[in-house]
């Protein structure tokens, strides 16, 4: 089943979402008229560019090179496929998405920015709490501001999201990158979400971070909507052939089959040195070591408090201390 939803909020009215249904009914954007834009934290530019090249054959804009005051001028207001790989936060006062370069975390995009978009658009965001809306006012949530203005489809996470800084990445990188690439290729937003979930589950046995990604990313908007293929079609007409994708239900308990463990000082030192080298902003932070009781793998979790949010690195490593995979919170 392809399911989308509309977020609710305190003191909402029918008119808040009336615009959405009018927009989706009369949208006439075809696949040849798609104009993409991407904005990413400088820290994640490598992985962001790999995915945005697949989506748009372009490079992303970066923050802190741009902040929320300059981003909208550089992104423009006429784009209709938007990609964001930024930080997000849960705090009610931290309403924006944030860039990063080393220890600099500027506000990169805000609810007021999204209201300036003039074209109808589809959006995907990798940020932690990128799709937050429960117990927030409209002006505190980019999701709410988007869905009550020009947004036709929005995919994001309600909780902490994870990805990588280099290579094709993982988790949120795969989810949002595959989703927007599929939308760009003419699939409905519901089908695109299904393809993204299928891509995430197809490689191997899922670990805790991948299971959480499947549970935390939600689609907002009519799942049957897609950019039309020619000017004689209507955007809300279902595809004639809908692929049958098998997406196995994740083992939710697998996300919590962890126990605190100990390794030798030598092994912990090897792991720490690797993390401190790749992520110098975490230098000196001591990790908590966990063991997955289902398969015996180890992970080291580093937490760093910033002014607006907590950053997390979860590094899976072998018995000899070699880093196998690294997940970075968004």
Question: How should these model regions be labeled?
Answer:
Residues 126-242:
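Active-site-proximal C-terminal subdomain of hydrolase catalytic domains
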Residues 1-20, 85, 90-178:
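Catalytic cores of nucleophile-dependent amide-cleaving enzymes
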């Amino acid at each position: 089943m392809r399911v989308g939803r509309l977020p609710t909020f305190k003191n909402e009215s029918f008119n808040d979402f009336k615009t959405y249904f009018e927009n989706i009914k009369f949208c006439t954007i075809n696949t040849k008229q798609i104009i993409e834009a991407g904005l990413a934290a400088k820290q994640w530019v490598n992985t962001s560019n790999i995915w945005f090249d697949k989506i748009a054959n372009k490079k992303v804009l970066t923050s802190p090179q741009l902040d929320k005051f300059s981003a909208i001028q550089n992104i423009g207001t006429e784009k209709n496929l938007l990609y964001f790989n930024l930080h997000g936060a849960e705090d009610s006062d931290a309403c924006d998405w944030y860039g990063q370069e080393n220890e600099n975390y500027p506000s990169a995009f805000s609810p007021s920015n999204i209201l300036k978009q003039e074209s109808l658009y589809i959006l995907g965001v990798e940020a932690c709490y990128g799709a937050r809306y429960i117990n927030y006012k409209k002006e505190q949530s980019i999701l709410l501001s988007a869905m009550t203005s020009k947004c036709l489809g929005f995919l994001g996470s309600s909780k902490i999201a994870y990805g990588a800084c280099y290579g094709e990445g993982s988790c949120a990188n795969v989810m949002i990158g595959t989703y927007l690439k599929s939308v760009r290729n003419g699939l409905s937003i519901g089908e695109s979400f299904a393809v993204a979930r299928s891509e995430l589950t197809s490689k191997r046995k899922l670990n805790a971070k991948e299971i959480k990604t499947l549970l935390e990313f939600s689609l907002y908007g009519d799942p049957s909507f897609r950019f039309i293929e020619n000017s004689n079609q209507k955007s809300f007409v279902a595809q004639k052939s809908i692929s049958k994708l098998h997406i196995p239900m994740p083992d939710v308990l697998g996300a919590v089959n962890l126990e605190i463990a100990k390794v030798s000082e030598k092994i912990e030192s090897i792991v720490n040195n690797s993390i401190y080298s790749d992520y110098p902003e975490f230098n000196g932070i001591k990790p908590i070591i966990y063991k997955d009781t289902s398969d015996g793998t180890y992970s080291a979790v580093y937490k760093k408090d910033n002014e607006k949010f907590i950053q997390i690195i979860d590094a899976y490593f072998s018995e000899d201390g070699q880093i196998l995979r690294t997940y970075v919170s968004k």
